[in-house]
Amino acid sequence: MSPSQQQTSVFNALGSYADRIKDANGNFIKSSPSSSSSATPEPTSLSSSTSGKKAFSTATSKSGQQKQGSSPQPGAITAEDDGPWETVQSTRARQRTDRSEEKEKRGSSSKNWRERSHRDEKNQDDGEKRNGRERSKKEKGDKSNSAPFVGSATSSEKTAKSLSSSTKNAWGVTSSSQGENPIASNPGPKQKAQNDSTFRSSSAAAPVGPTTSTINEIIKQSEGSDEDNWRARPAKVEKNEKTEGPVSITQAQPQPQRQLAPPPSVNIWDLRKKMSVPVLVSPTSATSAVAGIPPKSDKEKSLTNGMVKEEDSGTGKSLSKKKSAAAAAAAGTSSTPPSIHDATLWPDIIQAAEVVKAGEDKKEKAKERLNSESASVAEESTIGIGKKPKWTPIPAHELLAAADHAAEQSRRQNRMEAKKRSSGREGGESGPTGSGAPGKSNKTRKGMPAAEGKKARKEGAQQKDGHASSKAGETIGAGTGKANGDVKETKEGDARSASQQESSSHRSGPSISASANTGIDSSLHARTKSTPNASTTPLPPHTFNLASSSNLPRSTRGRGEGRGSFGGGRARGGFRSSGALGHKGQLGHGYGHVHGQGQGFGYGYGSPPMGVAGLPVEGIIYAPLNPGAGAGAGASPNLYQRGYGMGFQPFYPAATAAASAGEGGPTGAAAGDAAGVYDPAAAVYGNMGMYKSASMPPPPMPQTVVPNLDPLRFYVLGQVEYYFSMQNLAMDFFLRQQMDSEGWIDIAMIASFNRIKSLTPETSIVRECMILSNYLEVREDKVRLSGAESHRWVLPDAAPSKFGPDPRSPSLAEGAESSEERDGAASGSQSGLVTAGEEGAQGLQASPRRMFGAQDVKDALMKSSALSTVNGEIKEKEEVKAMENEGEESENYEQ
């Protein structure tokens, strides 16, 4: 391939970058579609040329003319002031330009702001990169073709120096003149402008014999422009290594190696040391000489070395060393800084460690003091300063036993005080009641710590002499303290302590004479204006000793039975009434002499005096009188512990009572102790297996007294009678909806209630118990309230009854009284009462029928005790008021 063909092909390859040529300022040259070159060549000589730019401009103009004449291009040729130029067609470049212009109009889709802001620079760098590669190819081709025409090294070096200040070339353009005509040395102003602006313009390069000077100028010009283009440097190094001749070796001469800088004539560190030492030492020397304190420089060094100790805590020896060293430094003995090997300048590690250890010890002591304070406060009260004490679970039976002991002791004290008052009122003399021990126990129980309670419990279990009564209060305190402490006692210990307390109380308590019993009995009957009735159903034929009676539940503290009468019964739940019992006798007979038992500790029970609706009368003192039992007037045993039925008088089933309290048999706590579990209900109901669960309260006590009744029928009877009680019917609308027009209810409906089914699933047993009741009337498979009460609770829209009116029914015989009762007359309740003789003659029932009026229901629901009718008799207002005053006085005294 000839040099001209190579140059032509190279130019054609590089022609697409013609519109990316930059001027001296780095701006793109806006070339028109048809660019022209000078038409008239002005030959100049290389020797007379003053600048490489002019020579190159002339050469390119001549080559443009030669290309125009020899090989014309299809592009249009236009003539301008500088001459004809050939238009280079570049579709690829135009497409790229159009695409870039559209991109500029739209904006870049890139999210990088750097790409958007440097869009033009990126395009320029791409053009320069391509131009550098093409220029290196062109230069290699030119050197291989122009080897025979290489000029002298001297002229080449001069030309390179003249071209070193030229602008950048987009590529190395090789151009030669058509002949060896000399180039004009003095070009016109138009030619100079052309040299400055189109120094990289595109022109066809197809000379046959290019001159040596022109080639060298172009090569050196491109080399000079490559110095500013970092992309062309690697190509330049390769070119210098492979080119021949001394010219390329001279041009590719590397720069001299960098040498280390000579050391400075002045050492800055020595100069700084000389300048800093007098400034720091000289002003402190005077002050240290006068005051004798260490200089500032020494203090700063000690702080930077990690000095942690305080100067006050240092020893005198270390301080003297520091002062001497500081004084020597202040006197100017040494101009250099003190040595690091001087031990006096470093902090005392041992002393610093002691200071740190002392601080830690102080913190630990503060923490211990705080913990001890919180522990002491936690012992005094259940809630500590910042955190709760650790909770220790306590078995339920221990809590129940402790609560029972505490309640029993307080009740015993109240009974003793009431007994003393009642004896004083009646003129009877009683010995020392021994209330000092309960008083002491009550005072001890309130502020008893857990540790003392535990000790007291052990002593109480060991002692069996007369001093056991004084230990009873401490035992109660221990039971109370177990809820907050960690005391864990066995059940046997609880039972033994309880039995010892009871026995000691029995020994210490005096007995009441029979005359005192008779006097109290007569006074109570006189006060209520009622007489004993011989037809009263006898009590169960068994006796109770003190151990079993002490575990009996008692009434609430400070009030009699009548206060919580209708306190909380909810529909068919536990009966909370303290209503009267079914028999006619208002007070029990034969306290200790039932069935001819003249002596002994028979724990007989009576019923309270009944009001118009079977309500107990406030202020009337009624209580079991048991010699030596410590139970006085004003309180009666409460079978329903912890709020289960507040105040039924205890009539025990014969079988259960005989089994639990027979001769020589275990009773009360002893029975529970033998079983290994303390069961307060064992002393009340006997061995009742079905009520071991705490979730099932015992059923209400029956108001009808039936002797020798087995436990099952005893409980069923009490539950059934509660369903038909005034307290339940006043709230149980569902049960009233089951009544027909005559008040009859299906027995199967009653037997389907959950409490009845928990006792027995047999409907026949339920019917049998209903027949035993004094307040219910049974016919076939129906049951209703007896007497006129059957119509009181019937709803207006009740279904018609399948039974017609019974001529023998008391409701027909007492129709007038029933109508008066429906109208709410006050005398209605009295008119419904019949004597016991009439009942015996008729053989109907052994107990009076309850005749409820509208006012009775209201009084029962509102817990009203100010009734004008007492025991079926209309009292005068003065008498009622006097009775109320007496009741209030006794209650206040008990509280």
From Swiss-Prot:
<feature type="compositionally biased region" description="Low complexity">
    <location>
        <begin position="496"/>
        <end position="508"/>
    </location>
</feature>
<feature type="compositionally biased region" description="Polar residues">
    <location>
        <begin position="172"/>
        <end position="184"/>
    </location>
</feature>
<feature type="compositionally biased region" description="Low complexity">
    <location>
        <begin position="251"/>
        <end position="260"/>
    </location>
</feature>
<feature type="region of interest" description="Disordered">
    <location>
        <begin position="24"/>
        <end position="265"/>
    </location>
</feature>
<feature type="compositionally biased region" description="Polar residues">
    <location>
        <begin position="192"/>
        <end position="216"/>
    </location>
</feature>
<dbReference type="InterPro" id="IPR045180">
    <property type="entry name" value="La_dom_prot"/>
</dbReference>
<dbReference type="InterPro" id="IPR036390">
    <property type="entry name" value="WH_DNA-bd_sf"/>
</dbReference>
<dbReference type="InterPro" id="IPR006630">
    <property type="entry name" value="La_HTH"/>
</dbReference>
<feature type="compositionally biased region" description="Low complexity">
    <location>
        <begin position="325"/>
        <end position="336"/>
    </location>
</feature>
<dbReference type="Pfam" id="PF05383">
    <property type="entry name" value="La"/>
</dbReference>
<dbReference type="GO" id="GO:0003723">
    <property type="term" value="F:RNA binding"/>
</dbReference>
<feature type="modified residue" description="Phosphoserine">
    <location>
        <position position="847"/>
    </location>
</feature>
<feature type="region of interest" description="Disordered">
    <location>
        <begin position="870"/>
        <end position="895"/>
    </location>
</feature>
<dbReference type="GO" id="GO:0005829">
    <property type="term" value="C:cytosol"/>
</dbReference>
<feature type="domain" description="HTH La-type RNA-binding">
    <location>
        <begin position="706"/>
        <end position="796"/>
    </location>
</feature>
<feature type="compositionally biased region" description="Basic and acidic residues">
    <location>
        <begin position="452"/>
        <end position="468"/>
    </location>
</feature>
<feature type="compositionally biased region" description="Basic and acidic residues">
    <location>
        <begin position="485"/>
        <end position="495"/>
    </location>
</feature>
<feature type="region of interest" description="Disordered">
    <location>
        <begin position="796"/>
        <end position="857"/>
    </location>
</feature>
<feature type="compositionally biased region" description="Low complexity">
    <location>
        <begin position="152"/>
        <end position="170"/>
    </location>
</feature>
<dbReference type="GO" id="GO:0045727">
    <property type="term" value="P:positive regulation of translation"/>
</dbReference>
<feature type="compositionally biased region" description="Gly residues">
    <location>
        <begin position="563"/>
        <end position="572"/>
    </location>
</feature>
<feature type="compositionally biased region" description="Basic and acidic residues">
    <location>
        <begin position="405"/>
        <end position="428"/>
    </location>
</feature>
<protein>
    <recommendedName>
        <fullName>La RNA-binding domain-containing protein LHP1</fullName>
    </recommendedName>
</protein>
<feature type="region of interest" description="Disordered">
    <location>
        <begin position="359"/>
        <end position="590"/>
    </location>
</feature>
<feature type="compositionally biased region" description="Basic and acidic residues">
    <location>
        <begin position="873"/>
        <end position="884"/>
    </location>
</feature>
<dbReference type="GO" id="GO:0010494">
    <property type="term" value="C:cytoplasmic stress granule"/>
</dbReference>
<feature type="compositionally biased region" description="Basic and acidic residues">
    <location>
        <begin position="359"/>
        <end position="371"/>
    </location>
</feature>
<feature type="compositionally biased region" description="Basic and acidic residues">
    <location>
        <begin position="296"/>
        <end position="314"/>
    </location>
</feature>
<feature type="compositionally biased region" description="Basic and acidic residues">
    <location>
        <begin position="95"/>
        <end position="143"/>
    </location>
</feature>
<comment type="function">
    <text>May act as an RNA-binding protein.</text>
</comment>
<feature type="region of interest" description="Disordered">
    <location>
        <begin position="285"/>
        <end position="344"/>
    </location>
</feature>
<keyword id="KW-0694">RNA-binding</keyword>
<feature type="compositionally biased region" description="Low complexity">
    <location>
        <begin position="31"/>
        <end position="75"/>
    </location>
</feature>
<feature type="compositionally biased region" description="Basic and acidic residues">
    <location>
        <begin position="228"/>
        <end position="244"/>
    </location>
</feature>
<feature type="compositionally biased region" description="Polar residues">
    <location>
        <begin position="510"/>
        <end position="521"/>
    </location>
</feature>
<dbReference type="InterPro" id="IPR036388">
    <property type="entry name" value="WH-like_DNA-bd_sf"/>
</dbReference>
<keyword id="KW-0597">Phosphoprotein</keyword>
<feature type="compositionally biased region" description="Acidic residues">
    <location>
        <begin position="885"/>
        <end position="895"/>
    </location>
</feature>
